[in-house]
Amino acid sequence: MPQSRREAIYKVIMRHDVAVIEDDPYWLLAGDAAPPIAALGLSSTSGPPVFYVSTLSKCLAPGLRTAYLVVPPSEPIEPILDALRSLSLMPAQTMVSSVTHWIQEGAAQEWMRQIRQDAGQRQKIAASILPGKPIAHPYGLHLWLELSPKLDQYRLIQTAQEQGLGVTSSDVFCPYESSPGAIRIALGGAPDHARLQVALEKLADILLSADKPQRIAAIV
């Protein structure tokens, strides 16, 4: 999300004077992302609070069930700590200690660099195989693929699932009644590039077959 869009969102937050929780799991992975919306809130002394939440399970390793919360200076932290204790008592101390050590020693940053490089290679593989022009961040772990208006995305998804491929329809992510004709494709699930390529080639074949005009046999 560009800086201009973040600033526009923060103006809406200020206009309606609402507290906001900014859930931003992929900011570290992007590498070139603009500062979070919460950073805009820190520069304002009279604006509503923006709480910033980020997790390591999305950008570093799925097993690291560790998240961080940045509380605005204007907000008391005690009620938040009470709420967290009532929900989870406390985080796993060994995991938090290990992650903190990795961050302080620079290991986490190096792993992030490797993950970012791998994600970029996966995006290039997808762009070389899939028809059309995928919509994605260069280092994203998923992409969006617009479909031809004549394609039934639900039938397409069912066909893909029958061949062991998991894709998601756009209406899962759209708050409106009508969603754009597109599918979301995750690229991080395949354990290596070779199996990712095989899966994408299967999906490309499904897309190309579905886009061909159906021949209707004449009944005599």
Regions found by a protein language model. Name each.
Residues M1-V220:
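PLP-dependent class I/II
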